[in-house]
Swiss-Prot record:
This is Protein-L-isoaspartate O-methyltransferase. It comes from Pseudomonas putida (strain W619). GO terms for biological process: methylation; protein modification process; protein repair. NCBIfam families: pimt, PRK00312.1. One of its GO terms (cellular component) is cytoplasm. It catalyses: [protein]-L-isoaspartate + S-adenosyl-L-methionine = [protein]-L-isoaspartate alpha-methyl ester + S-adenosyl-L-homocysteine. It is found in: Cytoplasm. The active site is at S60. Pfam families: PCMT. CDD domains: AdoMet_MTases.
Length: 212
């Protein structure tokens, strides 16, 4: 289940699906995904599929985690990334190995607490967590040169656009909850924002308000 051979099969699959950034692949290879799912699902941890983590949330499929991370890093190294939707902490753990600092916002307290414990166990200490409404971002620590959103919004929240630094990149799924959505790459340029649609995806909805 957790053997190196099992993880290498996942890496091979990601490469076949088009992931090519060696740093992203190494981070996926090093990260024990089975620690981020319930024990009953641990035997499926290295399948390239999303899995439930409770509270109507999921851990994203490894390909999507790798793809979004790769898009974020496409223009070069990042030192300050905002993650909206900590969830299990798996995407957080990948980012923590790729960028200097991660600031992660989660609205469901129990999920955030579990994610914190997992990252401490993995000795990933360059992450700061906030329990709150992800739609608001984290204005107090803005701007960010990367923003990654792990839940779908009907439209891009203005607060997140405002918190993106000049030249910064945001990867976000946009569209109606429960239907086919579009993954978008947004770049803050001198004259405004450029937007590139990257393909169809399906994510859980980005909801308002923290939950204890």
């Amino acid at each position: 289940m957790t053997s190196q051979r099992t993880r290498e099969r996942l890496i091979q699959r990601l490469c076949e699906e088009g992931v090519s950034n060696p740093k992203v692949l190494d981070a996926i290879r090093r990260t024990p995904r089975h620690l981020f799912v319930d024990e009953a699902l641990a035997h499926r941890a290295y399948e390239d599929t999303a899995l439930p983590i409770g509270h109507n949330q999921t851990i994203s499929q490894p390909f999507m985690v790798a793809h979004m991370s790769e898009l974020l890093l496409e223009a070069g190294p990042l030192d300050k990334v905002l993650e909206i939707g900590t969830g299990s902490g798996y995407q957080t753990a990948i980012l923590a190995q790729l960028v200097e600092r991660v600031f992660s916002v989660e609205r469901i307290k129990v999920l955030q607490d579990r994610a914190k414990e997992r990252l401490v166990e993995l000795n990933l200490r360059n992450v700061v967590f906030r329990w709150g409404d992800g739609c608001d971002g984290w204005q107090a620590l803005a701007p960010y040169n990367g923003i990654i959103v792990t839940a779908v919004a009907p439209e891009v929240p203005q607060a997140l656009l405002d918190q993106l630094a000049p030249g910064g990149r945001m990867v976000i799924p946009v569209g109606p909850a429960g239907e086919v959505q579009q993954l978008m790459l947004i770049v803050r340029e001198e004259q405004g924002f450029s937007r590139r649609v990257l393909g169809a995806v399906r994510f859980v909805p980005l909801l308002n308000g923290p939950v204890a």
